[in-house]
From Swiss-Prot:
Pathway in which the depicted protein is active: Pigment biosynthesis
Protein name as annotated: Multicopper oxidase aurL2
A Gene Ontology molecular function term of the record: copper ion binding
Signal peptide (residue range): 1-17
Similarity annotation: Belongs to the multicopper oxidase family.
UniProt cross-references to SUPFAM superfamilies, sorted A to Z: Cupredoxins (SSF49503)
Residues reported to bind Cu cation 1: 84
Conditions for induction: Expression is regulated by the aurofusarin biosynthesis cluster-specific transcription factor aurR1/GIP2.
Species whose genome carries this gene: Gibberella zeae (strain ATCC MYA-4620 / CBS 123657 / FGSC 9075 / NRRL 31084 / PH-1)
Top-level division of the source organism's lineage: Eukaryota
Keywords: Copper, Glycoprotein, Metal-binding, Oxidoreductase, Repeat, Signal
């Protein structure tokens, strides 16, 4: 037998859990309703899965050291849904990461689930929430801001979240079916890129409705603003510049405060978040003259076609300037085509605690190298055409949500909890870190891993870029480069520099096309496995199409005894162990919920 089965172990639960029915007296802090609605995006009606009727959904505000309850209703006919708290996986209660078939069962149609989240000191920053089922993320997302419990690390006068999204005219189901079909059908590029739901493709006076107008960012003169760029795009990496406002300072990346880093433009990929400080012009400069409005230009990068749009930075002046009659004939901002050098080896964490905890190369116990490329699971590549079923694979092995669902897979975390089933560590060492039986990567508490993603161009010879995202605790981002990873050479960067903790960084491409099956490009992470980050976590490409096609991995940190010791004993968790169990409420049945954190029990 290739799995280890451990006998049920005693649990110490009472100290950190209460088992309660969430009846009519329970009042969640936020309510999200997932529905299938016809909404206008890019001035076209689209049947879309949304939260609370809009895309993006409402902004959620959390605070460090406070527990927040968020109730999610699934009112989508015949569809599951989950919500993933992107960048805050480690702060969600057990069975609440939002990853179906990994950390929890999805929420069935007609039911609801109460998510419990508690950020800690050091988590203040920019995040977002989104569905983690199929292609739903393309419209089912919203901003999530964690506020500082203490005085913020940087001073600013205003705080402006800006969510970036992709717009596809085709509906989710059509796109997903094409990606999984035989023969495979690619989704194509998005029809538009949106900021705060606006595509910026039409002028204020020509647009049939506001959804294709530029989004307007209102500012006051002589102030400093924190611009939080949050990318919920399905596919697009964007470059963005603000006319006549090139002096930006990065102060945060993926929820981690950074030492200030000067830059003249924004670059953000699916799943990434950056905060930039921008000082506005004086009142004399803008309100005393004839120009108080400035174009914001954004363009996609590293894709076959450039998708672009505009937003507008508008100053508040006593003399109100009318909105521009038309979009610029030529862009007033020139954006670089170079992507792979953006802030590489430039972002150092502000947290002295995290900087001191950075493991050196001499502490690394194991390096796991994962080569990413396309494979054909049926058919063949003939005359430049992928004629068959296409998957994205890690070391030759795809992980597809639909395949696992068809196999009626029980979520990994629940398998561990109920049966003590964990990946076989010895077998994994024989297969480049991967256990082929459980289809998971195991790691032991005490290990320090270097995880190296390699970009291979597969049978077509074409490279893509991949924004790689880690669930659970963030990783020290070791940088990236062309060719393959050389640990000794790369470690030289860290003699007087400590990389910041991140959860989403790019595996870049360094050429468009080359000799097939060639590896050129790497991204490396470092993580220490401790008692704090034990659990079952995903690491995957945050391009939604690639994840649907199999570019995902599951990691199990810790052994069964350690993982199960993190959970309360039955009956506290009984309702989480089956699909639609008693932890999932209905119109007629109130849920029985494990209140995991102790500072707030409604």
């Amino acid at each position: 037998m290739l799995f280890r089965f451990l006998a049920l172990l005693p649990f110490v639960a009472g100290a950190f859990a209460e088992y309660k029915v969430h009846d009519d007296t329970f009042k969640p802090d936020y309510v999200l309703e997932a529905t299938l609605d016809d909404i206008k995006i890019n001035c076209v009606s689209r049947s879309s899965i949304v939260f609370n009727g809009t895309s993006p959904g409402p902004t959620i505000y959390l605070q460090e050291e406070q527990t927040t309850w968020i109730r999610v209703y699934n009112k989508i006919p015949d569809n599951n849904v989950t919500v993933h708290w992107h960048g805050l996986s480690q702060r969600a209660a057990p069975f609440s990461d939002g990853t179906p078939l990994v950390s929890q069962w999805p929420i069935p149609a007609g039911q609801f689930f109460d998510y419990e989240i508690r950020p800690e000191i050091g988590d203040a920053g920019s995040y977002f929430y989104h569905s983690h089922v199929g292609f739903q993320i393309v419209t089912a997302f919203g901003a999530l801001i964690v506020r500082d419990a203490r005085k913020p690390e940087y001073k600013y006068d205003g705080d402006i979240p800006l969510l970036v999204g992709d717009n596809y005219a085709a509906e989710d189901e059509v796109i997903e079916q094409g990606l999984l079909a035989d023969p495979f059908k690619w989704s194509g590029e998005p029809q538009a890129i949106t900021i705060q739901g606006n595509s910026g493709n039409k002028s204020f006076y020509e647009a049939p409705d506001s959804s294709c107008m530029p989004h307007v960012v209102h500012v006051d003169p002589g102030k400093t603003y924190r611009l939080r760029f949050i990318s919920a795009t399905a596919l697009s990496m964007i470059k963005l510049g603000i006319e006549d406002h090139e002096n930006l300072t990065v102060i945060e990346a993926d929820g981690s405060y950074t030492k200030p880093a000067k830059i003249d433009h924004v670059q953000v990929s699916p799943g990434q978040r950056y905060s930039y400080l921008m000082k506005t012009k004086t009142s004399k400069e803008v309100c005393g003259g004839d120009k108080s409005q400035y174009w914001i230009r954004y363009e996609s990068r590293d894709r076959p076609k450039v998708i672009s749009g505009y937003a507008l930075l508008k100053y508040r002046c006593d003399k109100n300037q009318k909105l521009p009659k038309s979009l610029p004939e030529t862009s007033p901002i020139e954006l670089s085509n170079s992507t792979a050098d953006y802030l590489e080896y430039a972002l150092e964490g502000l947290s002295e605690k995290n900087n001191q905890a950075f493991p050196k190369l001499s502490e690394v116990t194991r390096t796991v190298v994962i080569q990413i490329n396309q494979i054909l699971t049926t058919g063949a590549y003939v005359n430049g055409t992928l004629n068959g079923t296409v998957a994205w694979a890690q070391n030759g092995l795809p992980w597809k949500e639909n395949v696992q669902a068809e196999r009626r897979q029980v979520p990994y975390l629940i398998q561990i909890y109920e049966n003590g089933t964990t990946p076989n560590y010895t077998l994994a060492l024989e297969h480049h870190g991967f256990d082929p039986e459980t289809k998971a990567f195991p790691a032991k508490v005490g290990e320090v891993l270097d995880i190296v993603w390699e970009n291979n161009n597969g049978p077509t010879g074409g490279w893509d870029y991949h924004p790689m995202h880690v669930h659970g605790y963030h990783v020290y981002d070791l940088g990236s480069g062309n060719g393959t990873y050389n640990a000794t050479e790369n470690e030289a960067h860290f003699e007087n520099f400590t990389p910041v903790l991140r959860d989403t960084t790019n595996l870049y491409r360094y050429a468009v096309k080359g000799v097939p099956h060639h590896t050129a490009g790497w991204r490396a992470w470092r993580i220490r496995i401790t008692e704090e980050n034990i659990g079952a976590w995903m690491m995957h490409c945050h391009i939604a199409q690639h994840q649907v096609m199999g570019m995902a991995t599951v990691w199990v940190f810790g052994d069964a005894e350690q993982i199960r010791g993190k959970f309360p004993a039955p009956p506290y968790t009984q309702g989480y162990l089956t699909y639609g169990g008693s932890a999932y409420g209905t119109e007629d049945d109130q849920p029985w919920v494990n209140e995991y954190y102790s500072d707030k029990n409604n």
